């Protein structure tokens, strides 16, 4: 392969190099002074004579132009009233991810809202009506985040938490893991409520047999399958033993196929 010819530095090259160096240094100094962010490691400023080929020089010019371009949100920053600084690119990313999480949560709630829920063995209305009496998070175990508002972020740790949480929750596998963890937590709650109770032992074994997505829909639709009815520290609430028998009765109906679990895999 033929080697690229060594660059011949022209007057217009010198002028453009000087302009880009000036703008780059000014950008670094301005950002450091205004936001306390040191960008000096983000771009090199080599001597003009160090470029061996025109291709090398052109590549550096592109990098320097991008670095100083106000449209490059990666190097544009905002500082809120609490002194928290973030790039506009990061703020925009968290906003996008938050909107996507809201969309996913709304999609899941809309898929289940018309389903009947049961209490005392009888239909008591729809899941949407149940949500209206409490909250979506209370019924579904899924929290719908509020719109991201950078002006209200008080600390960098809070910003990192929001960034990581929203990014994680855009992954569909997050909700699959949530269903698995919800089932495990409920089984643990039942286990912690009794020292010795045969019906509870039977319930625990039956719960372990249920696929996580089926359990999640049963959790949504049966009021007795509730953490409020059990206590994982070993203390029981009133009528909890009777509640065990009610859940076993529901699970018998589930095994017979009496529940239309059409949310499976949603």
Curated annotation (Swiss-Prot):
Annotated site (Positions the 3' end of the template strand at the active site of the DNA polymerase): 230
Renumbered residue ranges of the record's region Intermediate: 74-172
Keyword Phosphoprotein: yes
Molecular function (Gene Ontology), one example: hydrolase activity
Positions of region (Interaction with the viral DNA polymerase): 256-258
Entry keyword Lipid metabolism: no
Location of the protein in the cell: Virion
Keywords of the record: Covalent protein-DNA linkage, Degradation of host cell envelope components during virus entry, Degradation of host peptidoglycans during virus entry, DNA replication, Early protein, Hydrolase, Phosphoprotein, Viral DNA replication, Virion, Virus entry into host cell
Superkingdom assignment: Viruses
Gene3D superfamilies from the UniProt entry: 6.10.250.960, DNA terminal protein Gp3, priming domain
Pfam families, sorted: Phi-29_GP3
Residue span of region Disordered: 1-73
Coiled coil: none
Priming, as annotated region: 173-266
GO cellular component: virion component
Location (main, coarse): virion
Sites of O-(5'-phospho-DNA)-serine modification: 232
InterPro entries membership: DNA_terminal_Gp3 (IPR008770), DNA_terminal_Gp3_C (IPR043124), DNA_terminal_Gp3_sf (IPR037216)
Entry's Gene Ontology BP terms: DNA replication, synthesis of primer; symbiont entry into host cell via disruption of host cell envelope; symbiont entry into host cell via disruption of host cell wall peptidoglycan; viral DNA genome replication
Annotated function: Acts as a primer for DNA elongation during viral genomic replication. Acts as the small terminase protein during packaging. Recruits the phage DNA polymerase to the bacterial nucleoid. Primer terminal protein (TP) is covalently linked to the 5'-ends of both strands of the genome through a phosphodiester bond between the beta-hydroxyl group of a serine residue and the 5'-phosphate of the terminal deoxyadenylate (dAMP).
Quaternary assembly: Interacts with the viral polymerase; this interaction allows the initiation of TP-primed DNA replication at both viral DNA ends. Binds to ssDNA. Interacts with the replication protein p1. Part of a DNA-gp3-gp16 complex.
Family as reported in the entry's similarity comment: Belongs to the phi29likevirus DNA terminal protein family.
Protein name: DNA terminal protein
Gene encoding the protein: 3
């Amino acid at each position: 392969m033929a080697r690229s010819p060594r660059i011949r530095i022209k007057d217009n090259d010198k002028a453009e190099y000087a302009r880009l160096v000036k703008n780059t240094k000014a950008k670094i100094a301005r950002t450091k002074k205004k936001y306390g962010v040191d960008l000096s490691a983000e771009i090199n400023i080599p001597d003009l004579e160090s470029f061996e080929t025109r291709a090398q020089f052109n590549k550096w010019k592109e990098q320097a132009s991008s670095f100083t371009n106000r449209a490059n949100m990666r190097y544009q920053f905002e500082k809120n009233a609490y002194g928290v600084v973030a790039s506009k690119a990061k703020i925009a990313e968290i906003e996008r991810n938050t909107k996507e999480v809201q969309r996913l949560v709304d999609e899941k709630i809309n898929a289940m809202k018309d389903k009947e829920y049961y209490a005392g063995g009888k239909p008591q209305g729809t899941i949407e009506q149940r949500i209206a009496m409490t909250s979506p998070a209370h019924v579904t175990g899924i929290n719908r985040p509020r719109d991201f508002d950078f002006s209200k972020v008080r600390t960098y740790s809070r910003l990192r938490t929001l960034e990581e949480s929203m990014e994680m929750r855009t992954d569909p596998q997050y909700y699959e893991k949530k269903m698995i963890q919800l089932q495990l937590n409920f089984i643990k709650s039942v286990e912690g409520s009794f020292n010795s109770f045969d019906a509870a032992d039977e319930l625990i074994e039956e719960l372990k047999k249920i696929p996580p997505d089926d359990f999640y829909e049963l959790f949504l639709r049966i009021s007795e399958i509730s953490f409020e009815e059990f206590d994982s520290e070993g203390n029981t609430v009133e009528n909890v033993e009777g509640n065990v028998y009610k859940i076993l009765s529901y699970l018998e109906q589930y095994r017979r196929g009496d529940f239309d679990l059409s949310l499976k895999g949603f």
